[in-house]
Amino acid sequence: MNFEGKIALVTGASRGIGRAIAETLAARGAKVIGTATSENGAQAISDYLGANGKGLMLNVTDPASIESVLEKIRAEFGEVDILVNNAGITRDNLLMRMKDEEWNDIIETNLSSVFRLSKAVMRAMMKKRHGRIITIGSVVGTMGNGGQANYAAAKAGLIGFSKSLAREVASRGITVNVVAPGFIETDMTRALSDDQRAGILAQVPAGRLGGAQEIANAVAFLASDEAAYITGETLHVNGGMYMV
């Protein structure tokens, strides 16, 4: 998998899965623009990417911010070839206690942003007759999870959105797919007690948590020419926790 000459935009790239994706695409030759919600986060991305790309501040819920970032990318690097929608948040609560803003924040950040970003890069991809759009979903989007009705709805929505868009643009050489992680090793999971960790692992036939690099590898495959005939799919990376 060689991405020489390709421009990749990865949202939410300051740490965790987003950083692993950005570093993996850069290591394989892409120029990577990673985004963060703060200037400090954007600078951190610039620091780790070095000559392989740049960090920019982006509010994925703001159309003006999206257009500004894309203008900067066009001016310095060119049109986006690979879009990785990774930015996301959680606002967990039981439905009976969930406030409207907790619902709306998740839908805007985790779902509507994918619509806006995908639309913003689409014209150039169609003109080139080539493009890759990969969105980071979640196992919760297919199996559900108590206390996450908002998050699960958004992640399920990503799947329907991606399937529909895939049908619209497949004839132009553009693929649209979802990678749905299960439990992934993060700072949060590392802070769990032994009992809490055991409870999670009991749900995973593989007997371990996944790594951010394993998600990045899946994204890199879907972004590659080797995956040119795969579109409208959701690739589940969850150690057997949920099998579709």
Swiss-Prot record:
NADP(+) binds at residues 12-15, 37, 59-60, 86, 151-155, 184. It comes from Escherichia coli (strain K12). Substrate binds at residue 138. SUPFAM superfamilies: NAD(P)-binding Rossmann-fold domains. Calcium ions stabilize the structure, and may inhibit FabG activity by obstructing access to the active site. Ca(2+) 3 binds at residues 233-234. Pathway: Lipid metabolism; fatty acid biosynthesis. One of its GO terms (cellular component) is cytosol. Changing residue 233 to K: Decreases in the thermolability of the reductase. Belongs to the short-chain dehydrogenases/reductases (SDR) family. Homotetramer. The keyword NADP applies. Ca(2+) 2 binds at residue 145. PANTHER family: 3-OXOACYL-(ACYL-CARRIER-PROTEIN) REDUCTASE (PTHR42879), 3-OXOACYL-[ACYL-CARRIER-PROTEIN] REDUCTASE FABG (PTHR42879:SF2). Optimum pH is between 6.0 and 7.0. Inhibited by cinnamic acid derivatives. Keywords: Calcium, Fatty acid biosynthesis, Fatty acid metabolism, Lipid biosynthesis, Lipid metabolism, Metal-binding, NADP, Oxidoreductase. One of its GO terms (biological process) is fatty acid elongation. It comes from the Bacteria. It is an enzyme of class 1 (oxidoreductase). Its EC number is 1.1.1.100. It catalyses: a (3R)-hydroxyacyl-[ACP] + NADP(+) = a 3-oxoacyl-[ACP] + NADPH + H(+); 3-oxobutanoyl-[ACP] + NADPH + H(+) = (3R)-hydroxybutanoyl-[ACP] + NADP(+); 3-oxopentanoyl-[ACP] + NADPH + H(+) = (3R)-hydroxypentanoyl-[ACP] + NADP(+); 3-oxohexanoyl-[ACP] + NADPH + H(+) = (3R)-hydroxyhexanoyl-[ACP] + NADP(+). Changing residue 154 to T: Decreases in the thermolability of the reductase. This is 3-oxoacyl-[acyl-carrier-protein] reductase FabG. One of its GO terms (molecular function) is 3-oxoacyl-[acyl-carrier-protein] reductase (NADPH) activity. Transmembrane segments: none annotated. Catalyzes the NADPH-dependent reduction of beta-ketoacyl-ACP substrates to beta-hydroxyacyl-ACP products, the first reductive step in the elongation cycle of fatty acid biosynthesis.
